[in-house]
Amino acid sequence: MPERTRGFAHRIDVAIEPEYVWRALTTTASLRLWCSPAAEINPRPGGVFRANVDRITKLEAHIDVFVPERRLRLIYMPCPTLPSADSALVDDFIIEGADGMTILRLLGSGIPGDPAWDAPFMRLRVSWERAMTRLKDLLDGQRSKGASP
């Protein structure tokens, strides 16, 4: 029987154009402001994303989907500080803009339902929730200054 998996969803709404949200997701300097101080990205199809999501877990992902100002999907490589898994961990950032507003959704999936994953699941979910809040604050601040992230 296939392994049962779980996921999470986060959403922010910002009064800024999608291009600014995209830049915040795909430039190392911006990622370091809201995601992780050591974050790195090689923003292209097949590129790499690296970040410390918490003090324990350093993640590295392959950029599977790269559609400027629309979608960024990350497929994570196995991590030695996480329990083993038969499923791939995935984060899918989906950007939707209209009339000067942008909705950014983050859908995390593929996290094993095994009890060994309970604590890592909570750390990932909460860490991304906090990061998305920091991203919203960053983008709202940039909008009020009239500058890009």
How would you label these PLM feature ranges?
Residues 26, 102:
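Ser/Thr-centric signal marking residues that sit
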Residues 9-10, 16, 20, 29-62, ...:
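Short beta-edge strand/loop motif at the mouth of beta-sheet-based domains
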Residues 12, 106-109:
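Short, hydrophobic/aromatic-enriched beta-strand segments in well-ordered soluble domains
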Residues 3, 110-149:
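A conserved amphipathic terminal alpha-helix motif
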Residues 1-9:
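Short acidic N-proximal helix/loop "leader" segments that mark the beginning
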Residues 25, 35, 76, 139:
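Short, flexible helix/strand-to-coil boundary loops that buttress conserved ligand/catalytic motifs
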Residues 39-40, 56-101, 109-110:
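Hydrophobic-ligand binding "helix-grip"
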